[in-house]
Structure formats: structure tokens, C-alpha cells
């Protein structure tokens, strides 16, 4: 939720406090849900999702989601994080890097997102 707060502020000029983002953790993922995902060629990933709607509102949430194994986010593992962007000015773009653990941060990935956002808004 913390990273999503930062990304939404940058991309949509909208601040939402992390505690106000609907969040579902991974504790509800059962063995059966994992097996069902595998049977459907999917991987369960904890996804922070935000989307600007046609009416200007922004919908957002953090929750486990089934990602088709062909989707680039399905291959992100361990301490790595990724930001997958769909935009009008760019096709699908993914930024990837270490973003968890005591030393690595998502600053490099975030820096790339900021640079692209600045160029898209020119």
C-alpha cells in the first residue's frame, strides 16, 4: 500500500493514505487456491493495482490475484518488485528491480517511472 500511494501520487496526482487503500494479504491463500491457479496456467501474486476511470476517479486496491503465466508480472519473485504500466502514450511497459529486503529499495524503478511520467505529460 505504501508503494501504491507513491505511484498514485505521481501518476494520477492523487494522494491516498496507505491505510485507506483496500488491502487483502496473502493469509487467505489456501493450498486449493494455489492448485486451482496452477490448473488454469496462473500464478498467484500480491498485486497493488490502480486505474484511472473514464469519469476521472481512480480505483485502487492491494490483493492476491491470479496472473496468467504468460504475463510478465507472473515471473517476478523473491525480493524483486515490478511496476507494469498501460498508458495512452506508451504501450505496455514494465519496470523491474529489487524492492524488498533491508538494503535494496524500489528507488531505481520509481526513478524510471517518474522520468517516463514527466515525458508523457509534456
Regions found by a protein language model. Name each.
Residues 1-75, 80-82:
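Substrate-binding/catalytic subdomain of NAD(P)-dependent oxidoreductase enzymes
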Residues 49-51, 57-122:
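Catalytic, metal-anchored helix/loop core of enzyme active sites in primary metabolism
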Amino acid at each position: 500500500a505504501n508503494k501504491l500511494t507513491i505511484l498514485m501520487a505521481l501518476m494520477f496526482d492523487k494522494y491516498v493514505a496507505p491505510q485507506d487503500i483496500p488491502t487483502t494479504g496473502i493469509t487467505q491463500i489456501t493450498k486449493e487456491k494455489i492448485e486451482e491457479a496452477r490448473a488454469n496456467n496462473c500464478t498467484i501474486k500480491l498485486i497493488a493495482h490502480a486505474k484511472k476511470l473514464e469519469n476521472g476517479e481512480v480505483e485502487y486496491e492491494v490483493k492476491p490475484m491470479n496472473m496468467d503465466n504468460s504475463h510478465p508480472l507472473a515471473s517476478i519473485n523473491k525480493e524483486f518488485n515490478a511496476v507494469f504500466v498501460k498508458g495512452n502514450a506508451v504501450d505496455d511497459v514494465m519496470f523491474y528491480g529489487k524492492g524488498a529486503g533491508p538494503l535494496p529499495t524500489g528507488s531505481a524503478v520509481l526513478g524510471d517511472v517518474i522520468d517516463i511520467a514527466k515525458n508523457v505529460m509534456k
